[in-house]
Amino acid sequence: MDKNLFVALTIAIGSAMPAFAIGLLASKGLEAIGRNPEAASSIQTAMILAIAFCEAIAIYALVVALIIKFV
């Protein structure tokens, strides 16, 4: 098959799933802060750390797509 198709599928799936996870994390994090405002700082810290890990997966997908494209 065409390399460009594999690149497109890699970056599409590799960025769509982390985007879904980030949306779910933010939704549940804000819901938890709404229920317990005193714990907002610890919830926010954990939420930002989890979002960073999800973004790392999207960056790995970009790197894999670039490797497929140029190698």
Place the predicted regions along the sequence by residue.
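Hydrophobic alpha-helical transmembrane segments of small proteolipidic membrane proteins, enriched
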Residues: M1-V71
